[in-house]
Amino acid sequence: MTSASSMSVSVECVNICNLTKGDGNARSDCSALSCAWKAPRALTGFLASTAHPPVCSVYSCGRNGRKSRMKACAWQRYEYEVGFSEAPYFVNVRNILKSRLSCGGHKRWELYCVSAESSSGASSDVTVETLWEDLFPSISYLPRKELEFVQKGLKLAFEAHHGQKRRSGEPFIIHPVAVARILGELELDWESIVAGLLHDTVEDTNFITFEKIEEEFGATVRHIVEGETKVSKLGKLKCKTESETIQDVKADDLRQMFLAMTDEVRVIIVKLADRLHNMRTLCHMPPHKQSSIAGETLQVFAPLAKLLGMYSIKSELENLSFMYVSAEDYDRVTSRIANLYKEHEKELTEANRILVKKIEDDQFLDLVTVNTDVRSVCKETYSIYKAALKSKGSINDYNQIAQLRIVVKPKPSVGVGPLCSPQQICYHVLGLVHEIWKPIPRTVKDYIATPKPNGYQSLHTTVIPFLYESMFRLEVQIRTEEMDLIAERGIAVYYNGKSLSTGLVGNAVPLGRNSRGKTGCLNNADFALRVGWLNAIREWQEEFVGNMSSREFVDTITRDLLGSRVFVFTPKGEIKNLPKGATVVDYAYLIHTEIGNKMVAAKVNGNLVSPTHVLENAEVVEIVTYNALSSKSAFQRHKQWLQHAKTRSARHKIMRFLREQAAQCAAEITQDQVNDFVADSDSDVEDLTEDSRKSLQWWEKILVNVKQFQSQDKSRDTTPAPQNGSVWAPKVNGKHNKAIKNSSSDEPEFLLPGDGIARILPANIPAYKEVLPGLDSWRDSKIATWHHLEGQSIEWLCVVSMDRKGIIAEVTTVLAAEGIALCSCVAEIDRGRGLAVMLFQIEANIESLVSVCAKVDLVLGVLGWSSGCSWPRSTENAQVLEC
């Protein structure tokens, strides 16, 4: 068992240069090749990072009156002993000069002048042989036959880029080799590495074609290079018309990248490696380009790396971008990190020692593990900044930067037998940690039992090691060696050059060919879970083609997929992730469009909630659908939900559903409602009303003759007959929107009390009539009881709804708000079916009744209603209004 309590962080020269010390003596510690692709990395491997700020400060050094000007925005080298192992430690050069000069003991720094002026003569140092010598160590894991393919690709790239220079003045070939080296550090397959070497050859030269690449290296390499070329080529196009803007062209660029990703996942991985090296050398770009590229990286590429579980690349992209996007905030965060480390260094070292001792003394771990590594880790600069923003406090109030990461390497199953699994070992270690220190409530997170959608697995807990001496908080992470590998490399593990597996994700994401067919850390099912979000991109493209501009498409992805997420469960235990702030409406449309269209309510953790309920992490969500919902009711509900939909994809689906309902079912909604909706959605009113005219004979069918019935007289002989030709149409909010007609006649006519049935035109027979076949007889029996007590006509309202707490109160509140007088009320619950029936004896005129029924129909969980007037001598012929 090992423990790492300290480390040395050094930032190396990243340009082709002769370094100059403060005394003016020349140094040549770096060659033209070794420093270029390390630019600017604080660590080797995939924890590489930079220590330079994006703001230039000028310092002077020299002798004999000769000064050499040095800019802080060039890459510097310093060494500083810190207590965090294997983590990027970012320190601003200006802070180094101010505070580190006085530091003694184990703290030391060296600062060198960096110049690109001498790079012009470096091209002669670059040959295929020297390039191979520097690339080989990172890809030495590949078999000899595959190394030959990589070497062949290197020669082809060298020939294609011969004579080309980067903005820094270095040979262009340095860039593709650096990309290949990053891919090699991730131990990717040879096809990805060759694609990294050739990713710019077709675009930037006339020497290489896709056909030649396929002939030399196969269809997979061509497919990856072709995807890369499509992505990078569009960004260089100029606007073709005056209506196009630079943002539109860039959006189309990103759209093509997202679509290329859905065909081949390795297109993303190579693109991330390409962007990472470009970010490392971003200092050579003009300031406005630096800000633009860094912002795009922070908004698109870093979240993409996170979705793929590639946290090593994600962290470096975030930190590099953070320095350019917000230099002052970056300085404040790094300064806070340095101060906190100095303040809690002794506590961290002591906590590390105590934990290592506890693990070493545990006999169970000695039996089932090869070794257990305890690492001291510093949180990433940008993650600390985001946490401070989330808490809405000052960065100086943030005090939790340290982590202890425990990585367990279990013995092979043959040696351990059925004694335990790797997961059980992790839980055992968690128990050891809690034996030493009590956890802070609600800080224990089990990502082993419920992994994140990108596959991340680990146990997290936060403790206060020295409660009675200090409030120093320490996060402890526990994982196996395999979990740690997947956490750092993510989906890249699937394409590991040492062991590969391949297959298809449904019918949507082909994975490329497999050279050996071995199984690595991820199988096909694991892979499918981690890249399922790619299928959503393809579905959006197919579903909204022609309805969504490139900019809208990119906004949909960056907001709906790449933003902050919440994770919820389906009733079957599947994990679904949505943007933070998403509602049940977004969840329903994420599951399926038809589910969203037919939704009437939802259950969260077993409780009935509104579809506008904002989802929180770990909630179990179940959608309640209703197939027989009238078009009128569906239109009104979804129109209300539109403003509560968080995701752009859900809003597009709701808008399309509303257009369809407005065009097909105009008889159940007013023309004013349709026109208001069309105006809001920027649709063409004339096109919509033309469809309505063809299907429903325009709006004259909405206005029909009805008889305003009252319950003031028992006998219909005392009810005045209507005059011929009179027309009365009920209104809601001043608009005609109810059609009442005699169901026994095709022609509308006046209804006298006790004659026939008057009903509001339903889209179809309410389904609750089939579920509750005895509803009518139950209702009639209750009304008969009221007749027996009062001996006069009865006006009544019957409401069928889902069985949920508080729904009777909500319905009665609606009735009271409309001025409806309630005389009696009775309710029954069918718990087996989850339905409730409410019967109210009311006093109201027809206009108020129609108005209140429209509002009752919008109450959450209401499935339908009926209303009527009954007389003692003719109960069976009562008038009924039904929806």
Curated annotation (Swiss-Prot):
Statement: the UniProt record of this protein carries the keyword Ligase: no
Protein's organism: Arabidopsis thaliana (Mouse-ear cress)
Enzyme Commission no: 2.7.6.5
InterPro entries membership: ACT-like_dom_sf, Beta-grasp_dom_sf, HD/PDEase_dom, HD_domain, NT_sf, RelA_SpoT, TGS, TGS-like
Single GO molecular function: ATP binding
Catalyzed reactions: GTP + ATP = guanosine 3'-diphosphate 5'-triphosphate + AMP
GO biological process terms held by the UniProt record: guanosine tetraphosphate metabolic process
Designated name of the protein: Putative GTP diphosphokinase RSH1, chloroplastic
